């Protein structure tokens, strides 16, 4: 019987051979001069981890700023596209210096080739057919999302609904917030004002999506939904068209 590390190494060696055979097919998807393709690509040695992966760990911060951050989704272990977090969902990442957990709402997501010069092209194949005939495609794609910062939780567990002193550092892990965290955070609704001011986002649709998400997590608590609607009404009291648009999507 093989030991765990022996089986992992055998799997790695097999993957190395398969990848080197498949690399020659890349030119059919993203044509380049043949001299630019390596004859062989050496994959990194496997990392033998003892602990189980946290299923809420979905991405890593690759760009950060005061009001938002950009994150790249972690690659799945099988031949699948990385799973995007849903529009309007709440995620978190840490500021290691202060111990704060930064909360943010996902407002934009993309999947694109890692190579920014050569675009993907239509192949007329289903995803199952691609996994069978062109599995290297999935290693050549990246999924990224932008999240607008709406508040933070300090190291004592206190929630705040304004911008933190610092955003999360680059390369920090991004996690999905659990139900209890979102319920505690949404006891106050000042974050809705921040959402309605996010630059470069469809803020009315984003606000409505976030309200629907929280309403679902709160077991469709009608009193909370009414309070959220009233809060939006106060914020947008001078803009009836925007107010009507938001309210029409949360009923």
Indicate residue ranges for each PLM-predicted region.
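Short, well-ordered loop/turn sites that connect or cap secondary structure elements
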Residues: 82-86
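Short, solvent-exposed secondary-structure boundary/capping segments
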Residues: 68-73, 112-125, 147
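A structural micro-motif recognizing beta-strand termini
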Residues: 72-80
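Short, basic/aromatic beta-hairpin or loop at an interaction surface
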Residues: 56-73
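Short beta-strand-centered aromatic/proline hotspots
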Residues: 58-61, 100-111
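Intrinsic disorder
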Residues: 22, 27-30, 34-37
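Charge/polar-rich, low-complexity and marginally structured segments
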Residues: 137-251
